[in-house]
Amino acid sequence: MQVDIIKQVRDTKPLVHHLTNQVVMNFSANGLLSFGGSPIMAKAIEEVEQIAAISNAVLINIGTLTSTELESMIAAGKTANKHNIPVLLDPVGVAATSFRRNAIDKILEEVRPTVIKGNAGELASLVNINLEAKGVDSIGDGNLDVIAQKVSEKYNTAVVVTGETDVIYVDNHLIHNGTGHHYLSSITGSGCLLGSIIAACLTTKSTLKDQLMTAVSFYGLSASYAANQENVHGTGSFLPVFIDSLSKMPQELTEGE
């Protein structure tokens, strides 16, 4: 983990343009604000190109996708590519329906993502690996290393596969991350917020490898820190403490361990 990346985010407060799902907007916005970034949730086709052009990163998340939003996502992504602005693509539930899969195919035909992030089931679907999924959730793991590498090679992008052990594949390197807590898997939008944190880190002056590892490991560390506080007894009490923990520095999260 590179502490300087987190410091850069808090110094620059990067604007992250979210084209994300309705379920997680509030959680993603507050989590990113706590971390140090600045969220904007603009999806209207009339303004997405202008918003994307002034943003420091663009996040595309298809969790509650509509046909109108698909048009906006492609427009924002293409604008970001034109201006060399990093793009994170989160293909939420892509394995669930043909509508979602066709939408992701259209996005990837026109937009070059810097990073594709998803769970094992979602990313396995992108490379036609048969892995069981339930709605937007993965209920199998498969070989995450193989899935990450195949997605990276197919789309020429860095990849983050989330799970009990996260897998990052970037520049022909595999990285494994074991930080985190099982409460995250019981909270709607925890993976979506991770996308926001990654997007913020993509705006810093560092290598893509360090940006991804820092974002993923810090996020998991924040979760384990929050879960271990005396006033946390379940997911309901965990949530506000987790949001608070995202504003801390890594050394604060490991004190006393």
Curated annotation (Swiss-Prot):
Cofactor(s) named in the record: Mg(2+)
This protein's record includes keyword Transferase: yes
Residues binding substrate: M41, G189
Pfam families: HK
Disulfide bonds: none
The keyword Transferase is assigned to this record: yes
UniProt: ATP binding residues: K117, T162
E.C. number: 2.7.1.50
Gene Ontology terms, MF aspect: ATP binding; hydroxyethylthiazole kinase activity; hydroxymethylpyrimidine kinase activity; magnesium ion binding; phosphomethylpyrimidine kinase activity
Record family assignment: Belongs to the Thz kinase family.
Protein name: Hydroxyethylthiazole kinase 1
Organism: Oceanobacillus iheyensis (strain DSM 14371 / CIP 107618 / JCM 11309 / KCTC 3954 / HTE831)
